[in-house]
Amino acid sequence: METRNIFSWIKEQITRSISVSLMIYIITRTAVSNAYPIFAQQGYENPREATGRIVCANCHLANKPVDIEVPQAVLPDTVFEAVVRIPYDKQLKQVLANGKKGGLNVGAVLILPEGFELAPPDRISPEIKEKIGNLSFQSYRPNKKNILVIGPIPGQKYSEITFPILSPDPATKKDVHFLKYPIYVGGNRGRGQIYPDGSKSNNTVYNATGAGIVSKIIRKEKGGYEITITDTDGRQVVDIIPPGPELLVSEGEYIKLDQPLTSNPNVGGFGQGDAEIVLQDPLRVQGLLFFLASVILAQIFLVLKKKQFEKVQLAEMNF
């Protein structure tokens, strides 16, 4: 009886340990996955505001270029490439969260027309798969398959991103029509300057929150500074500078309100662009080809008829 109780106790302890380990794993994985690929997913139902501005610009304050290339027209139920280019100087290094320097990551959001979506793996050709590499795309929301996001990914390798897109078929999707549609893209390189909660990252300028004399500068053990500013009335304010930005002021210096205390370490930025694509009706294409063929045949018959007429005229003149 006692032996059976011991086995029951051991079984209970093992079950608890497995449950706790599983919970820790799930929580850790969730924290990591929720942090990426794009912070905007956490706070915005739609990444494109009514003004046309993509919300990534709220955190990535510097304006940088981005380019998108898509076919001029596609047929229904066809896989095509949408190529997003995020150019930047590969020699640049950014300030990481720990204050050290490292390579820049890139990320992108692609806003497709309703009905367009990420192509399933079995529909993607080997040529496109080779261009995609090991990239993994995801929908912005489970119910928004036409909005795709990716990142952060190493910019050194993926400053050009190929999205495999499947066009819709109006024959099976009644809300889709043969029209010209807009496509919007946003792309960033490097870390943002502001977090979604409004707090600053260490990849931006820090300004003085008061005017006065810099009475004390304490360099923290793990990096960063604690700057004490004393005004003319003897009141003090303390500004905390995280590791990363370079300090521009020194003790005894008089500074003004909102004067930069640090350099701007940001070397990245965000850009957005757009393109247009036509969902082409196959019957319209066939009709166009038939029309062109008939025009060419008419021209040929006209030339032949003209030569025949010239021969008749020449024969009559000789007669």
UniProtKB/Swiss-Prot annotation:
SUPFAM superfamilies the UniProt entry points to: Cytochrome f subunit of the cytochrome b6f complex, transmembrane anchor (SSF103431), Cytochrome f, large domain (SSF49441), Rudiment single hybrid motif (SSF51246)
Cofactor(s) needed by this chain: heme
Key words, A-Z: Chloroplast, Electron transport, Heme, Iron, Membrane, Metal-binding, Photosynthesis, Plastid, Signal, Thylakoid, Transmembrane, Transmembrane helix, Transport
Entry note: cofactor: Binds 1 heme group covalently.
Signal peptide start-end: 1-35
Membrane topology according to the record: Single-pass membrane protein
One GO biological process term: photosynthesis
A GO MF term: iron ion binding
Residue ranges crossing the lipid bilayer per the database entry: 285-305
Sites where the protein binds heme: 36, 56, 59-60
Disulphide-bridged cysteine pairs: none
Highest taxon listed in the record's lineage: Eukaryota
Record family assignment: Belongs to the cytochrome f family.
Quaternary state and interactors: The 4 large subunits of the cytochrome b6-f complex are cytochrome b6, subunit IV (17 kDa polypeptide, petD), cytochrome f and the Rieske protein, while the 4 small subunits are PetG, PetL, PetM and PetN. The complex functions as a dimer.
Name under which the protein is recorded: Cytochrome f
Organism of derivation: Coffea arabica (Arabian coffee)
Upper classification of the organism: Eukaryota, Viridiplantae, Streptophyta, Embryophyta, Tracheophyta
